[in-house]
């Protein structure tokens, strides 16, 4: 609509300029501009009195089905309180040497990195769970030479759900469930929603514990949860 309107304005203005200069050009476009102002006033009056303009197009939210992987460092505040610089350096090394390359190998996309955690999107839920398992196994091996109170351990939650897509973020219940599952996981462990697990069952090599329905924070209904216990070497 607006492209046509401004095109007409330009044409009228051009005709006026060719016919008689600037003053005639203004006379040519004045009627169209007057109608535009009248339209704007009418819409403003409707908003002012609480009336919605049902003719105005409502922008649609972009949505898609995605496998969501949420992770966080266990006891990060405690670790930084003991030695902030050492913790930051070791965590940065974990991201560079373990987590980032593992996510890339499994075709994941890091949506958000909070420093001590991340939100990652996968097209395949099988890739998401395999990535989580690999990260936890590698971290378990690295932690065998680290004192227990200084270990960097992750919790991971994986969900399959519908998400709202923004240019640099994703939102919605699918993301919220993944974050709550992460909080339910044991240090070094993984919690997976039933929707996600039904897609990966028989496709990943891992011991799985059926936790049954679990109450997740700020979610009205219990969610059926499956847990992949910590790999050997974690606490």
Predicted regions, residues:
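Intrinsically disordered or compositionally simple regulatory linkers and C-terminal tails
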Residues: 44-63, 228-235
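Alpha-helix boundary/capping and short turn/kink residues
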Residues: 15, 19, 84-85, 190
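Short, Lys/Arg-enriched, Gly/Pro-containing loop segments at transmembrane-helix junctions
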Residues: 35-47
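Catalytic NTP-binding/metal-coordinating core of nucleotidyl cyclase/transferase enzymes
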Residues: 51-138
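Catalytic beta-strand-to-alpha-helix segment of the class III nucleotidyl cyclase homology domain
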Residues: 100, 119-233
């Amino acid at each position: 609509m607006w492209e046509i309107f401004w095109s007409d304005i330009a044409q009228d203005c051009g005709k006026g300029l060719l016919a008689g200069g600037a003053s005639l050009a203004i006379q040519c476009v004045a009627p169209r501009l007057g109608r535009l102002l009248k339209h704007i006033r009418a819409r403003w009056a409707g908003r002012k009195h609480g009336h919605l303009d049902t003719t105005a197009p409502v922008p649609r939210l972009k949505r898609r089905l995605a496998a969501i992987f949420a992770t966080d460092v266990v006891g990060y505040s405690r670790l930084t309180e003991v030695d902030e610089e050492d913790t930051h350096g070791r965590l940065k090394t974990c991201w560079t040497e373990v987590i980032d390359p593992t996510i890339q190998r499994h075709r994941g996309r890091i949506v958000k990195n909070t420093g001590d955690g991340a939100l990652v999107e996968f097209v395949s839920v099988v890739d998401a769970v395999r990535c989580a398992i690999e990260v936890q196994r590698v971290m378990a091996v690295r932690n065998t030479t680290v004192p227990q109170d200084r270990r960097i351990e992750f919790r991971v939650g994986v969900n399959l759900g519908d998400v709202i897509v923004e240019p640099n973020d994703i939102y919605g219940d699918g993301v919220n469930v993944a974050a709550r599952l992460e909080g339910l996981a044991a240090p070094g462990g993984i919690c997976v929603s039933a929707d996600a697990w039904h897609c990966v069952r028989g496709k990943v090599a891992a011991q799985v514990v059926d936790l049954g329905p679990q109450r997740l924070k700020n979610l009205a209904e219990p969610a059926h949860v499956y847990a992949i216990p910590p790999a050997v070497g974690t606490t």
